[in-house]
Curated annotation (Swiss-Prot):
This is Inositol 2-dehydrogenase. It comes from the Bacteria. Gene3D superfamilies: Dihydrodipicolinate Reductase, domain 2, NAD(P)-binding Rossmann-like Domain. Its EC number is 1.1.1.18. It is an enzyme of class 1 (oxidoreductase). It comes from Corynebacterium glutamicum (strain R).
């Protein structure tokens, strides 16, 4: 494909609008040709960054009008399957924001439908795989330079969350990212999940018991613990420490200007994911567009990866009630090798 890829974005909320701006202004080889959004005001606002884009309220209408070559799905997870199905049936390349779908049953339906095509068409938007620091850490793991990887420790901290943030979202909206990137880093899938509760923060709203400590065991024996804290106040922080046989490595440390004054040491910290992972989002979209042009269609997490994450999330939610919850998955199909 030598022409500019015509991308239809489904959903013009904050994430969709961000992707529209990214594709039209910071991505080569693609442009926004359609905005699929039932809310007219949202669609109009997003269209300001996408001159010439057609407006539709349903993905089926955009497909019927031959308005798109590929689809980026940025609606909430519960609406993914109704968009994925017609897009797959039309044979369109898809970048689907996480999660693939909200549960393993619907994710498996998508996996089974996709396998009727000649190759994987879905890339799932777990952007951490495109973060330079995560890539450097994965290269270190694969190189064996520091010996075998023994343990991983993760920090996932948000300054605060709204009243609509529920207990299950600690797993399904937040730790969901670790359930993808940790197996990718370690080269081994999650086989069990456990949740521990430290002392509850007084800043957690009614009905929310946090922070939590999520403990994962991987198939290769690596143990992982992740602190999930959504009321840390000072900023947004995602960091990982890898313990090897011959040393350790850390990523996600604060960057930017450092100051010393009046007996104080001051550093800048991110306030949300849009700055911490800005480069990762840009690289994710550019890699996907390049893959579509090359005919490989997928340059990151695929639908099977999304299915495995759904299984891990379900185990994580069950683990709120105590115990070590197994994550049982069939072998990866050759289609996704």
């Amino acid at each position: 494909m030598s022409k500019s890829l015509r991308v239809g974005v489904v959903g013009a909320g904050a994430m969709g609008a961000d992707h529209i701006d990214r594709i039209n202004n910071r991505t080569s080889g693609a442009h926004i040709s359609a905005i699929i959004e039932p809310d007219a005001a949202r669609a109009a606002a997003a269209a300001e960054n996408a001159p010439g884009a057609q407006a539709f309220t349903r993905i089926e209408d955009a497909i019927a009008a031959d308005a798109v070559d590929a689809v980026l799905i940025a609606v909430p997870g519960q609406f993914h399957e109704p968009v994925l199905v017609p897009a797959l049936e039309a044979g369109l390349p898809i970048l689907c924001e996480k999660p693939l779908t909200p549960d393993s049953e619907s994710s498996l339906r998508i996996v089974e439908l996709e396998q009727k095509l000649d190759k994987p068409h879905i890339q799932v938007g777990f952007m951490r795989r495109f973060d330079p620091e995560y890539n450097n850490l994965r290269k270190l793991v694969e190189s064996g330079e520091a010996g075998e990887l023994l343990m991983l420790r993760g920090l996932h901290r948000n300054p605060s969350v709204g009243e609509n943030y529920t207990q299950s979202m600690l797993i399904t909206d937040s730790v969901v990212h670790e359930f993808d990137v940790i197996p990718w880093l370690a080269g081994s899938r999650v086989v069990s999940v456990e949740v521990k509760y430290p002392k509850t923060s007084s800043l957690a709203h009614s009905g929310l018991k946090e922070p939590i400590l999520v403990i994962m065991e991987l198939e290769n024996g690596v143990l992982v613990d992740v602190e999930m804290n959504v009321n840390i106040q000072f900023g947004y922080q995602v960091a990982t420490e890898a313990v090897f046989e011959k040393g350790l490595a850390r990523i996600g440390q604060p960057s930017g200007m450092q100051r010393w004054r009046d007996g104080e040491f001051l550093i800048n910290e991110h306030t949300d994911f849009t700055t911490r992972f800005a480069t990762a989002y840009d690289r994710q979209i550019q890699s996907w567009v390049d893959a579509v042009h090359e005919g490989t269609l997928v340059a990151g997490p695929n639908a099977w990866d999304g299915y495995l994450v759904a299984l891990s999330c379900e185990a994580g939610v069950k683990a709120f009630d105590g115990g070590v919850i197994p994550v049982d998955a069939a072998p990866r199909p050759d289609f996704y090798a």
